[in-house]
Amino acid sequence: MEAVLVAMSVPATTEDDGFSLITDKLSYNLTPTSDVEIVTSDNRRIPAHSGVLASASPVLMNIMKKPMRRYRGCGSKRVIKILGVPCDAVSVFIKFLYSSSLTEDEMERYGIHLLALSHVYMVTQLKQRCSKGVVQRLTTENVVDVLQLARLCDAPDVCLRSMRLIHSQFKTVEQTEGWKFIQEHDPFLELDILQFIDDAESRKKRRRRHRKEQDLYMQLSEAMECIEHICTQGCTLVGPSNVVDNNKKSMTAEKSEPCKAFSTCYGLQLLIRHFAVCKRRNNDKGCLRCKRMLQLFRLHSLICDQPDSCRVPLCRQFRKRGEQDKKMGEDTKWKLLVTRVVSAKAMTSLCQSKKNKCEQAQGV
């Protein structure tokens, strides 16, 4: 059966090994001009031109440079055997070498075979297209087979996407024949897959833990702003302790307006009021709520950049204590906490600034 190729023109060049690219329009219908025959698994013979094959594939070029073997019935034509794949896949492969065209139907039918051929014969353009096409057609049924081929064909993108699909649908993939096959015949691949899944789960846990930590630092950053806001301006329940306002009505009106972070601010107000009247604060056993408030006061003192004029209670006292701890080398954990809280505050400010700009742009 004679395959049909799209006609194309090829620029003429001269090679040291004795063969040159053909400058006429090429097609399989012009069998007298062909000087190569591609033999497939079922002995189908596909006529081709050495110049075109050599220009499209460095592997085929090396084959052309070797001394030609004589085969009965082939005359003076060079014979190249491409075995191990369907004959139609070979026809599509040769057609691509001529025309660089590949239909979706051909990709659907022979994508895996074309990926193997493009790797063996080093046809980069075809390999890239096949990699994308094979990835788009991955299913739980074929993913293990595709992964095995991708490893052999040095297709890292296909390997990665296959691994991710196996990870996300592992329970389904476990029931497939492909998985059962590698369990019996390729334990190293099975181990690699399980290792990939384990690493992916570990990364997911680390990301989840990191998000929780970032949320905590964001909350602490918000708490620091609320403490300063409460002790400087006052809020619904608590006002500044060292500011006397003769206009009580205006003071009440100012306090009655809740701040933006009301839930955090309200909780801190309750803590501050408890801290002010708690009798167990100085006991040996102590008070858990008071200890928490003291820790927040200490964190504020380490972040505060205006300790002399700060109205937050115990700010200057903790500042002096922090300097003593620094000399003794006992502030490492607090220093790390301050760094992360300050970073979280900077990120929050940046996000808020971008949000405000977007809102202004939309308003305009």
From Swiss-Prot:
<dbReference type="InterPro" id="IPR044513">
    <property type="entry name" value="BT1/2/3/4/5"/>
</dbReference>
<dbReference type="GO" id="GO:0009734">
    <property type="term" value="P:auxin-activated signaling pathway"/>
</dbReference>
<protein>
    <recommendedName>
        <fullName>BTB/POZ and TAZ domain-containing protein 2</fullName>
    </recommendedName>
</protein>
<dbReference type="GO" id="GO:0009733">
    <property type="term" value="P:response to auxin"/>
</dbReference>
<dbReference type="GO" id="GO:0009751">
    <property type="term" value="P:response to salicylic acid"/>
</dbReference>
<comment type="function">
    <text>May act as a substrate-specific adapter of an E3 ubiquitin-protein ligase complex (CUL3-RBX1-BTB) which mediates the ubiquitination and subsequent proteasomal degradation of target proteins. Plays a key role as a component of the TAC1-mediated telomerase activation pathway certainly by targeting a telomerase repressor to degradation. Seems to occupy an integral position in a complex signaling network that perceives, integrates, and responds to multiple, and sometimes competing, signals. Enhances responses to auxin in postgermination and vegetative development.</text>
</comment>
<dbReference type="GO" id="GO:0009737">
    <property type="term" value="P:response to abscisic acid"/>
</dbReference>
<dbReference type="Pfam" id="PF02135">
    <property type="entry name" value="zf-TAZ"/>
</dbReference>
<keyword id="KW-0833">Ubl conjugation pathway</keyword>
<comment type="subunit">
    <text>Interacts with CUL3A. Interacts with GTE11/BET10 through the BTB domain.</text>
</comment>
<dbReference type="GO" id="GO:0042542">
    <property type="term" value="P:response to hydrogen peroxide"/>
</dbReference>
<dbReference type="GO" id="GO:0009555">
    <property type="term" value="P:pollen development"/>
</dbReference>
<dbReference type="GO" id="GO:0005737">
    <property type="term" value="C:cytoplasm"/>
</dbReference>
<dbReference type="GO" id="GO:0016567">
    <property type="term" value="P:protein ubiquitination"/>
</dbReference>
<dbReference type="GO" id="GO:0005634">
    <property type="term" value="C:nucleus"/>
</dbReference>
<keyword id="KW-0863">Zinc-finger</keyword>
<feature type="zinc finger region" description="TAZ-type">
    <location>
        <begin position="215"/>
        <end position="316"/>
    </location>
</feature>
<dbReference type="InterPro" id="IPR000197">
    <property type="entry name" value="Znf_TAZ"/>
</dbReference>
<dbReference type="GO" id="GO:0009753">
    <property type="term" value="P:response to jasmonic acid"/>
</dbReference>
<dbReference type="InterPro" id="IPR035898">
    <property type="entry name" value="TAZ_dom_sf"/>
</dbReference>
<dbReference type="GO" id="GO:0009743">
    <property type="term" value="P:response to carbohydrate"/>
</dbReference>
<dbReference type="GO" id="GO:0005516">
    <property type="term" value="F:calmodulin binding"/>
</dbReference>
<dbReference type="InterPro" id="IPR000210">
    <property type="entry name" value="BTB/POZ_dom"/>
</dbReference>
<dbReference type="GO" id="GO:0008270">
    <property type="term" value="F:zinc ion binding"/>
</dbReference>
<dbReference type="GO" id="GO:0010182">
    <property type="term" value="P:sugar mediated signaling pathway"/>
</dbReference>
<dbReference type="GO" id="GO:0007623">
    <property type="term" value="P:circadian rhythm"/>
</dbReference>
<dbReference type="GO" id="GO:0009738">
    <property type="term" value="P:abscisic acid-activated signaling pathway"/>
</dbReference>
<keyword id="KW-0862">Zinc</keyword>
<dbReference type="Pfam" id="PF00651">
    <property type="entry name" value="BTB"/>
</dbReference>
<keyword id="KW-0963">Cytoplasm</keyword>
<dbReference type="GO" id="GO:0009651">
    <property type="term" value="P:response to salt stress"/>
</dbReference>
<feature type="domain" description="BTB">
    <location>
        <begin position="34"/>
        <end position="106"/>
    </location>
</feature>
<dbReference type="GO" id="GO:0010167">
    <property type="term" value="P:response to nitrate"/>
</dbReference>
<feature type="short sequence motif" description="Nuclear localization signal">
    <location>
        <begin position="203"/>
        <end position="212"/>
    </location>
</feature>
<feature type="region of interest" description="CaM-binding">
    <location>
        <begin position="327"/>
        <end position="350"/>
    </location>
</feature>
<dbReference type="GO" id="GO:0009611">
    <property type="term" value="P:response to wounding"/>
</dbReference>
<dbReference type="GO" id="GO:0006355">
    <property type="term" value="P:regulation of DNA-templated transcription"/>
</dbReference>
<dbReference type="GO" id="GO:0009553">
    <property type="term" value="P:embryo sac development"/>
</dbReference>
<dbReference type="InterPro" id="IPR011333">
    <property type="entry name" value="SKP1/BTB/POZ_sf"/>
</dbReference>
<dbReference type="GO" id="GO:0009409">
    <property type="term" value="P:response to cold"/>
</dbReference>
<keyword id="KW-0479">Metal-binding</keyword>
<keyword id="KW-0539">Nucleus</keyword>
